[in-house]
Protein backbone atom coordinates (compact mmCIF):
# COMPACT_ATOMS: atom_id res chain seq x y z
CA UNK A 1 0.00 0.00 0.00
CA UNK A 2 1.24 3.50 -0.80
CA UNK A 3 0.19 6.84 0.61
CA UNK A 4 1.68 9.79 -1.24
CA UNK A 5 2.32 13.33 0.00
CA UNK A 6 3.79 16.24 -1.95
CA UNK A 7 7.41 15.32 -1.20
CA UNK A 8 7.47 11.63 -0.25
CA UNK A 9 5.46 8.45 -0.02
CA UNK A 10 4.66 6.10 2.84
CA UNK A 11 4.80 2.43 1.83
CA UNK A 12 3.58 -0.64 3.67
CA UNK A 13 4.11 -4.38 3.14
CA UNK A 14 2.91 -7.49 4.96
CA UNK A 15 4.62 -10.88 4.65
CA UNK A 16 3.73 -14.20 6.30
CA UNK A 17 6.23 -17.07 6.48
CA UNK A 18 5.56 -20.57 7.83
CA UNK A 19 8.05 -23.06 9.25
CA UNK A 20 9.76 -24.48 12.33
CA UNK A 21 13.21 -22.87 12.07
CA UNK A 22 14.27 -20.29 14.68
CA UNK A 23 15.35 -18.12 11.71
CA UNK A 24 11.79 -17.89 10.37
CA UNK A 25 11.28 -14.41 11.82
CA UNK A 26 14.44 -13.15 10.17
CA UNK A 27 13.28 -14.64 6.84
CA UNK A 28 9.94 -12.83 7.15
CA UNK A 29 11.77 -9.61 8.05
CA UNK A 30 14.08 -9.99 5.04
CA UNK A 31 11.16 -10.50 2.66
CA UNK A 32 9.40 -7.44 4.09
CA UNK A 33 12.53 -5.27 3.86
CA UNK A 34 13.16 -6.45 0.27
CA UNK A 35 9.58 -5.58 -0.71
CA UNK A 36 9.89 -2.13 0.89
CA UNK A 37 13.29 -1.54 -0.75
CA UNK A 38 11.87 -2.55 -4.14
CA UNK A 39 9.34 0.26 -3.72
CA UNK A 40 12.02 2.85 -2.92
CA UNK A 41 12.74 2.64 0.82
CA UNK A 42 16.38 3.07 1.87
CA UNK A 43 17.91 1.02 4.69
CA UNK A 44 21.16 1.64 6.54
CA UNK A 45 23.24 -1.17 8.00
CA UNK A 46 25.03 -0.83 11.33
CA UNK A 47 28.54 -2.35 11.41
CA UNK A 48 28.92 -5.83 12.91
CA UNK A 49 29.80 -5.83 16.61
CA UNK A 50 30.96 -8.54 18.99
CA UNK A 51 28.86 -9.86 21.89
CA UNK A 52 30.85 -7.84 24.46
CA UNK A 53 30.37 -4.68 22.44
CA UNK A 54 26.70 -5.62 21.98
CA UNK A 55 26.08 -5.55 25.75
CA UNK A 56 27.78 -2.15 26.02
CA UNK A 57 25.84 -0.94 22.98
CA UNK A 58 22.55 -1.99 24.60
CA UNK A 59 23.29 0.28 27.54
CA UNK A 60 24.41 3.16 25.30
CA UNK A 61 21.52 2.71 22.85
CA UNK A 62 19.02 3.48 25.59
CA UNK A 63 20.72 6.84 26.12
CA UNK A 64 21.21 7.54 22.40
CA UNK A 65 17.92 6.21 21.10
CA UNK A 66 17.05 9.46 19.35
CA UNK A 67 20.49 9.78 17.68
CA UNK A 68 19.51 7.88 14.50
CA UNK A 69 16.14 7.93 12.84
CA UNK A 70 14.98 4.37 12.08
CA UNK A 71 14.90 3.29 8.44
CA UNK A 72 11.49 1.66 8.88
CA UNK A 73 9.11 0.31 11.49
CA UNK A 74 7.73 -3.20 11.80
CA UNK A 75 5.14 -5.07 13.78
CA UNK A 76 5.35 -8.86 14.25
CA UNK A 77 2.65 -11.44 14.97
CA UNK A 78 3.62 -15.03 15.72
CA UNK A 79 1.04 -17.83 15.72
CA UNK A 80 2.25 -21.22 16.88
CA UNK A 81 0.74 -24.66 17.57
CA UNK A 82 0.21 -25.92 21.10
CA UNK A 83 3.14 -28.36 20.99
CA UNK A 84 5.83 -25.70 20.33
CA UNK A 85 7.96 -24.76 23.34
CA UNK A 86 7.93 -21.09 24.33
CA UNK A 87 11.74 -21.11 24.30
CA UNK A 88 11.57 -21.47 20.49
CA UNK A 89 9.30 -18.41 20.28
CA UNK A 90 11.69 -16.44 22.51
CA UNK A 91 14.58 -17.45 20.22
CA UNK A 92 12.63 -16.17 17.19
CA UNK A 93 11.98 -12.87 19.00
CA UNK A 94 15.64 -12.53 20.03
CA UNK A 95 16.89 -13.08 16.47
CA UNK A 96 14.33 -10.59 15.14
CA UNK A 97 15.41 -7.93 17.64
CA UNK A 98 19.06 -8.47 16.71
CA UNK A 99 18.30 -8.14 12.98
CA UNK A 100 16.20 -5.02 13.55
CA UNK A 101 19.01 -3.45 15.53
CA UNK A 102 21.54 -4.26 12.80
CA UNK A 103 19.42 -2.74 10.03
CA UNK A 104 18.19 0.25 12.08
CA UNK A 105 14.55 -0.87 11.98
CA UNK A 106 12.17 0.07 14.78
CA UNK A 107 10.42 -2.99 16.21
CA UNK A 108 7.03 -1.66 17.33
CA UNK A 109 5.95 -4.89 18.97
CA UNK A 110 5.86 -8.65 18.92
CA UNK A 111 2.62 -10.47 19.63
CA UNK A 112 2.82 -14.25 20.06
CA UNK A 113 -0.16 -16.51 20.63
CA UNK A 114 -1.09 -20.18 20.52
CA UNK A 115 -3.33 -21.03 17.60
CA UNK A 116 -4.68 -24.60 17.38
CA UNK A 117 -5.48 -24.08 13.68
CA UNK A 118 -1.81 -23.89 12.61
CA UNK A 119 0.53 -26.88 12.22
CA UNK A 120 3.75 -24.85 11.94
CA UNK A 121 4.88 -21.51 13.29
CA UNK A 122 3.46 -18.59 11.28
CA UNK A 123 5.33 -15.29 11.49
CA UNK A 124 3.64 -12.22 9.99
CA UNK A 125 5.74 -9.08 9.63
CA UNK A 126 4.10 -5.78 8.68
CA UNK A 127 6.57 -3.07 7.73
CA UNK A 128 6.18 0.61 6.97
CA UNK A 129 8.79 3.00 5.57
CA UNK A 130 9.20 6.39 3.90
CA UNK A 131 10.49 6.72 0.36
CA UNK A 132 11.04 9.63 -2.00
CA UNK A 133 8.09 10.39 -4.22
CA UNK A 134 8.24 8.80 -7.65
CA UNK A 135 8.19 11.13 -10.61
CA UNK A 136 5.78 10.43 -13.39
CA UNK A 137 7.44 8.68 -16.31
CA UNK A 138 7.01 10.23 -19.70
CA UNK A 139 8.71 9.97 -23.08
CA UNK A 140 10.23 13.48 -22.95
CA UNK A 141 12.18 12.92 -19.71
CA UNK A 142 13.24 9.33 -20.43
CA UNK A 143 16.90 8.79 -21.20
CA UNK A 144 18.62 5.72 -22.62
CA UNK A 145 19.80 3.24 -19.96
CA UNK A 146 18.08 5.19 -17.18
CA UNK A 147 14.57 3.73 -17.05
CA UNK A 148 13.38 0.14 -17.10
CA UNK A 149 10.05 -0.49 -18.77
CA UNK A 150 8.39 -3.85 -18.18
CA UNK A 151 6.22 -5.26 -20.94
CA UNK A 152 4.01 -8.31 -21.16
CA UNK A 153 3.25 -10.33 -18.02
CA UNK A 154 6.05 -8.68 -15.99
CA UNK A 155 4.56 -5.24 -16.67
CA UNK A 156 1.15 -6.27 -15.35
CA UNK A 157 2.45 -6.95 -11.84
What are the roles of these predicted feature ranges?
Residues 1-42, 49-64, 105, 130-135, ...:
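N-terminal glycine-rich phosphate/pyrophosphate-binding loops that anchor nucleotide-derived ligands
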Residues 42-59, 70-157:
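Glycine-rich anion-binding loops of enzyme active sites
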Amino acid sequence: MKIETQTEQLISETVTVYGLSPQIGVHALAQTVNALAAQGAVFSVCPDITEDEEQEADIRSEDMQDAHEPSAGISVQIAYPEYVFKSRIHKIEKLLKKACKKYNIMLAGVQASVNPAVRAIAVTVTGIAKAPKEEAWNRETARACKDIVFAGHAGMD
